[in-house]
Amino acid sequence: MENHQTTEQKRAIWQRVNPTLQPYPITAEQQAAQDAVNVCCMGAEAQEDIDVIRGFIEEELSDRRGYLSYAAAAPTPNARQLFRRLAAEEGGHARKLMGVYYLITGQVYCPAVPLPGKTCVPGWREVLRLRYHEESCGGLNYRRASEETSDECLTEIFLELSRDEYRHARQILCLLEKQMLI
């Protein structure tokens, strides 16, 4: 009597003999099924972007601290309100990215704790100028990251954060416009 075994049955036998051995190559359909598993959002593909995400978290937290500091020194109630709102939004961005980090790694991200120090606030217009450029660069960096990642969900999140950063830059420009005398 002839024994006809499928490739899967043969593979199972070899797995019992030596679990590290793969004597039968994976078929194209098995590879496609394995690839389909890795396509999901925040999966293996997103691991490549984990250092970028860490950097974005730290940047958002730094921006939040800066906005809170600038809000305390703002010359007008409108400026104080805007900077408090921007600080809250930057904190929200950091929390979102920390959630993304957890989805990818299964670990809670612990941000670096800055050493307390005296914050030197330059002239008000200079603060607005610096923050405008920081927000614009942040928008650009998120857009670039969205183009470079292979994870679809990360692409959407990075694009959303890019739009927020550009919106922040426009709000700061509006505040700066009010400071210009004609």
Describe the residue ranges of each PLM region:
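Non-heme di-metal
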Residues: 1-182
